[in-house]
Amino acid sequence: MDLQENIPLQSLNTFGIAATARYYSLVKSQAMLKQLLNNSSLHSLLKLTIGGGSNILFVKDFDGWVIHMDIKGIEKLGEDNNHIWLHVGAGVNWHSLVLYCIEKGYAGIENLSLIPGTVGAAPIQNIGAYGVEFSEVFESLEALEISTGLIKKFNKEACAFSYRDSIFKSSLKGQYIILQVTLRLNKQPTFQTNYGAIQEVLASMKPRTLSIKAISDAVIYIRQQKLPNPAYIGNAGSFFKNPIIDQAKATLLRNKYPNIPVHILANGYAKLPAAWLIEQSGWKGYRHDAVGVHLHQPLVIVNYGGATGKAVYKLAQAIQASVAENFSVMLEPEVNIIQ
């Protein structure tokens, strides 16, 4: 049945939070989605689109309709001397796409290995890791407007990408459902090894040649060492964004805290590592009942088993208040909080 009622969501979010959706649909095609949206009895419902459930926190049950996008398929649209264009369904697992590209020799997303979630969520969040952002390989996407049923194509400019952000998280939030994404990948790789511990790990791995496979292997190793596997410990990866502040404020913080890591950006701003701010505020390894902060990565809030969404959210708010008090910096959640 295309529309189900009172469906448990615990297995559909990587936090492993027990919550229930009033209505739920697993959507495997564009035609199926259009048919469902034509049901007038569903028009007034709150709607939530999910993919892998890896960037979401249910603080309570969802009294609306959860639309679970599962449109699959990877199609090569074309190529020239330098690039390959791929058309990818929103329901394709992101890491599976990365592995597919590595196997084919398509470069550009190897630094984004092992990021959980689906392709349809990647442009919403403008996912990024280890010096690379999704927007760098993005060409366009097709999305269905919920209110009209019309399909619109968005180019890079229309998506208004910024750090872990896009128009689909701001002015168009909840108005469109992404169906397919087109990526422009490179035939000749430009290796990004200057971020994090990639160079150090590559040196220990000693690959015969530097390749996109070697970069991916290094990133996978780093992520597996630092981040808990949600199959065993519930989490949504990085809970907070790295805050961006103006350089004047960064200078004040540097004067007060000489060891604070500051990454100067080209636009007159600076980025601070949220993990450092959280750790310096004393939260690393914190645990209260079933909820806590990961021992190795302070950016990750974890559910050790049986935690409620309210308990996770309460901890997140306490961390925000603590960092704001200590550093006069407000951390912004990267996770989509449903309350």
Swiss-Prot record:
InterPro entries: FAD-bd_PCMH, FAD-bd_PCMH-like_sf, FAD-bd_PCMH_sub1, FAD-bd_PCMH_sub2, MurB, MurB_C, MurB_C_sf, Oxid_FAD_bind_N. It holds the Pfam family FAD_binding_4. Its cofactor is FAD. Its main location: cytoplasm. Keywords: Cell cycle, Cell division, Cell shape, Cell wall biogenesis/degradation, Cytoplasm, FAD, Flavoprotein, NADP, Oxidoreductase, Peptidoglycan synthesis. GO terms for biological process: cell division; cell wall organization; peptidoglycan biosynthetic process; regulation of cell shape. GO terms for molecular function: FAD binding; UDP-N-acetylmuramate dehydrogenase activity. It catalyses: UDP-N-acetyl-alpha-D-muramate + NADP(+) = UDP-N-acetyl-3-O-(1-carboxyvinyl)-alpha-D-glucosamine + NADPH + H(+). Pathway: Cell wall biogenesis; peptidoglycan biosynthesis. It is found in: Cytoplasm. The active site is at 164, 238 (proton donor), 334. Residues 16-188 form the FAD-binding PCMH-type domain. Its EC number is 1.3.1.98. It comes from the Bacteria. Belongs to the MurB family. HAMAP family: MurB. This is UDP-N-acetylenolpyruvoylglucosamine reductase. It comes from Amoebophilus asiaticus (strain 5a2).
